[in-house]
Regions:
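An N-terminal, well-structured beta->alpha segment
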Residues: 1-62, 66-68, 150-177
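Phosphate-binding and adjacent anionic-ligand microenvironments
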Residues: 236, 273-450
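Gly/Ser/Thr-enriched, mixed-charge loops and adjacent short helices
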Residues: 13, 107-232, 450
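Short beta-strand-to-turn element immediately C-terminal to the catalytic PLP-Schiff-base lysine
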Residues: 111-114, 248-252, 332-334, 424
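Proline/glycine-rich low-complexity loops and linkers
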Residues: 125-161, 166, 252-325, 332-333
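N-terminal small/polar loop signature for handling phosphorylated ligands or for N-terminal nucleophile
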Residues: 32, 39-107, 192-250
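Short glycine-rich phosphate-binding loop at a beta-alpha junction
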Residues: 40-48, 72, 176-178, 279-285, ...
Length: 450
């Protein structure tokens, strides 16, 4: 049996891979695991705005209750809100039903422990064992008062909003902000946070209908936000993804700031305040060369992990560091929350703009981005490419052409049937050509997905 859990929980097309039956068995598995230490563990469940969310929420909650766990349903709420609230409200575990930046056809289920951290591999392996046992009807079925209860609490999102607002000491009064909620989990709470801090907020893509999450909007389709910022003569644009654990920004000139630039700005602020632990920022292998160079010039160190916020977080916890994240906009402020938090990230930068009395385009000038090209190859199989001689030769050839002024990175996606080809260096056209050559060979050798 293939492993259920990927790099960010269990994820797939709803009613094909991620069925309500699987959600039910995952609930029974999680209830069994967390029930080993407490007779009636209480779970907090949140979800994004996908049409399948309430169906999977019901199945997951039923599974948890069927083995004796209790459930509090928060409804539509960002992933980082669940991570925070589990810890702050004393829940025994949390679960989020979301496929993050993926299209609405997909959904996913991921769990958090009582400290708000995603589960380690060994616990996910145990849950998979319990899922198989549940499917074979081998797990306990308590009766009477051994069955768990379900409650609904729609106030929890407001507690999260209050928390985010109080991570800064600065009013945002005087700032005009365009907010793109990706028709996702922060469509209500995002505007609540920003307006509560005094900003003038123009909202776009905050009307979810179950089908429009991430559809030509949010952090994966930021073009509309760029236009809106300039149309409204705004100071800042903020884009979340579907579950609001990531954030990209747009400056007053319509230019995009990615996670590398956001981390650098926030890390420098922490350093100036004496709060940047180890004077170190944790990025990934996808971080831009310019990110590393700028950090060094500003007296900070950088570390690169594998792609995936779980690997960034793992390194941060092991080495007691303050800030880390991904170019895609997952930024973790470990002194505030235990996962990437799009709204928390956004208000840190907005506060910095107010404190420095500088437009974002000027603040972003501390880093010069090297051109970077990314080509995604949708493949029939994403395993075995590392051992393919033709693919290896194409990568070596490209690396030789770039020399010391650039690099090539090829990796399989952890969540989709993709192999990603990235090249970085001084010349955009050269990078595009090299990436396409490698991508063509990968497509031929691995087979293109239908």
């Amino acid at each position: 049996m293939a492993r259920l859990f990927g790099t960010d929980g269990v994820r797939g097309v709803v009613n094909e891979f991620l069925t309500p039956e699987l959600a039910y068995h995952l609930g029974r598995a999680a209830g069994t695991h967390f029930g080993k230490e407490k007779e009636h563990p209480t779970f907090l469940i949140g979800r994004d705005t996908r049409i399948s969310g309430s169906m999977l929420e019901s199945a997951l909650a039923a599974g948890i209750c069927s083995v004796g766990g209790n459930v509090v349903i928060a409804g539509v709420i960002p992933t980082p809100a669940v991570a925070y609230l589990v810890r702050q409200q004393g829940f025994d575990a949390g679960a989020v039903i979301s496929a993050s930046h993926n299209p609405y056809l997909d959904n996913g289920i991921k769990f958090f422990d009582s400290n708000g951290y995603k589960l380690p591999d060994e616990v996910e392996d145990e849950l998979e064992k319990y899922v198989r046992q549940s499917a074979d009807n081998e797990l306990a079925r308590p009766t009477g008062d051994g069955i768990g209860k379900i409650e609904f609490n729609s106030n929890l999102a407001h507690l999260y909003a209050h928390f985010v607002r109080h991570t800064i000491d600065t009013s945002l009064e005087g700032l005009t902000i365009v907010y793109d909620g990706a028709n996702g989990a922060a469509s209500s709470v995002g505007p609540e946070i920003l307006s509560g801090l005094g900003a003038k907020v123009i909202n776009i893509n905050v009307n979810p209908d179950g089908l429009n999450i991430n559809h030509h909007c949010g952090s994966t389709h930021i073009e509309g936000l760029q236009v809106a910022v300039q149309q409204h003569n705004a100071d800042l644009g903020i884009a979340n993804d579907g579950d609001a654990d990531r954030c990209l920004l747009v400056d007053e000139k319509g230019q995009v700031l990615d996670g590398d630039q956001i981390m650098l700005l926030c890390a420098l602020k922490l350093k100036e305040e004496g709060k940047l632990k180890g004077d170190t920022i944790v990025g990934t292998v996808m971080s831009n060369i310019g990110f590393h160079k700028a950090a060094e010039e500003l007296g900070m160190k950088t570390v690169s992990t594998a792609v995936g916020d779980r690997y960034v977080l793992e390194y941060m916890r092991e080495h007691n560091l303050s800030i880390g994240g991904e170019q895609s906009g997952h930024v973790i402020f470990l002194d505030h929350n235990t996962t990437g938090d799009g709204m928390l990230t956004a208000v840190q930068v907005a506060a910095l703009m107010k404190e420095k009395k500088q437009p974002l385009s000027e603040l972003a000038g501390i880093m010069t981005k090297y051109p970077q090209v990314l080509v995604n190859v949708r493949v029939a199989t994403k395993t075995g490419w590392e051992d393919n001689d033709l693919i290896k030769a194409a990568i070596v050839t490209a690396e030789g052409e770039l020399g010391d002024e650039g690099r090539v990175l090829v990796r399989a996606s952890g969540t989709e049937p993709l192999i990603r080809v990235m090249a970085e260096g001084p010349d955009q056209e050269t990078l595009q050509s090299l990436c396409e050559e490698i991508a063509d060979i990968i497509g031929r050798e691995q087979g293109l997905a239908e």
